[in-house]
Swiss-Prot record:
Family listed: Belongs to the GHMP kinase family. Mevalonate kinase subfamily.
Protein name as annotated: Mevalonate kinase
Binding site for ATP: 90-100
Function: Catalyzes the phosphorylation of (R)-mevalonate (MVA) to (R)-mevalonate 5-phosphate (MVAP). Functions in the mevalonate (MVA) pathway leading to isopentenyl diphosphate (IPP), a key precursor for the biosynthesis of isoprenoid compounds such as archaeal membrane lipids.
High-level lineage: Archaea, Methanobacteriati, Methanobacteriota, Methanomada group, Methanobacteria
List of catalytic residues: 141
Pathway: Isoprenoid biosynthesis; isopentenyl diphosphate biosynthesis via mevalonate pathway; isopentenyl diphosphate from (R)-mevalonate: step 1/3
Gene giving rise to this polypeptide: mvk
Assembly behavior: Homodimer.
E.C. no: 2.7.1.36
Gene Ontology BP annotations: isopentenyl diphosphate biosynthetic process, mevalonate pathway
Length: 303
């Protein structure tokens, strides 16, 4: 018996980290996917060719395998499985690889066991896995990997799908990743030491996100770049940027981008840039030292 499922990666446009503190965020599914295939086996094996992982144990653990192990504990019986993961995105890139993996694995397990859950239940169960593994996580990543398209997550944790023209966007990523759990914990520690200041920062991120949402609903992309720059300044204040991420952000702007910012947890990973009329120039500039691509978005979530 064999079953498969795939889920898209994501780019957070506005609101990362603030979303952990019940602030809204906007994210879009990108056309890079994680596909998981599970099949009967005499013992449990996990193979992830893109990461060079071949792992055999009843309880996979360590790094990205923690998400697989927790999914099996919660949503599978004790029978052994052969699990193969095909990833079109680098792990730890800030593009939601762990969420896409978790959603795809839950989808594959549901099909394997003949279960039929709706997207809301799937997203909630995937979010539980991320919380268990990371200690804290917003529901945004798992929501976008489940639903696809564009998602606005409001302050009440309600998912609102919407349509909008995002204009020309570029994503670039580093060769090293930031550890999401460590970055989230770092922001939490700064919040503990400076609660009033950090509270105001999160409130301002909320205002930026809601302004972007209103403009996107009007299909007005003109202010997106400036709003990204404002959001980036606040991410820097949270302590999640690095020297090289900042270099990427400014290289994109110097090449003509209207705005650019970290996308994801930071500490490594990726940036996103709004590049009206200058996508090729920005991609060329960023590719001199990093890896960049035009952002192609996916309307499809879990399939």
């Amino acid at each position: 018996m064999k079953s498969s499922a795939s889920a898209p990666a994501k780019a957070i446009l506005f609101g990362e980290h603030a979303v952990v503190y019940s602030k809204p965020a906007i994210a879009a599914a990108i056309d890079r996917r994680v596909t998981v295939t599970v099949s009967e086996s005499s013992s449990t094996h996990v193979t992830i060719p893109s990461l060079g992982i071949r792992h055999s144990s009843e309880r996979p653990s360590g790094g990205i395998l923690d998400y697989i192990g927790r999914c099996l504990e919660l949503y599978h019986d004790a029978s052994p499985l052969d699990i193969r993961v095909e990833m079109e995105i680098p792990a730890g890139s800030g593009l939601g690889s762990s969420a896409a993996l978790t959603v795809a694995l839950i989808g594959a397990l549901d099909r394997y066991h003949g279960r039929d859950h709706g997207p809301g239940e799937t997203a909630a169960r995937a979010h539980r896995v991320e919380v268990d593994v990371q200690g804290a996580a917003s529901p945004l990543d798992t929501a976008i990997s489940t639903y696809g398209g564009l998602v606005y997550l409001d302050s009440q944790r309600r998912v609102r799908q919407f349509e909008a023209d995002l204009g020309d966007l570029v994503i670039a990523h580093l060769d090293y990743s930031g550890e999401t759990a460590r970055m989230v914990a770092g922001v939490a520690e700064r919040f503990r030491r400076f609660p009033d200041i950090m509270g105001r920062i999160m409130d301002t991120v909320e205002s930026i996100t809601n302004t972007a949402y209103r403009e996107l609903l009007r299909n007005n992309t003109e202010p997106l770049g400036e709003l990204m720059n404002l959001n980036q300044g606040l991410l820097d204040s949270m302590g999640v940027s690095t020297r090289e991420l900042s270099m990427m952000v400014y290289e994109a702007r110097n090449a003509g981008a209207a705005g650019s910012k970290i996308t994801g947890a930071g500490g490594g990973g990726s940036i996103i840039a709004h590049c009206p009329g200058c996508v090729d120039d920005v991609v060329t500039a960023l590719n001199r030292n990093w890896k960049a691509m035009r952002a192609e978005f996916s309307v499809k979530g879990l399939i």
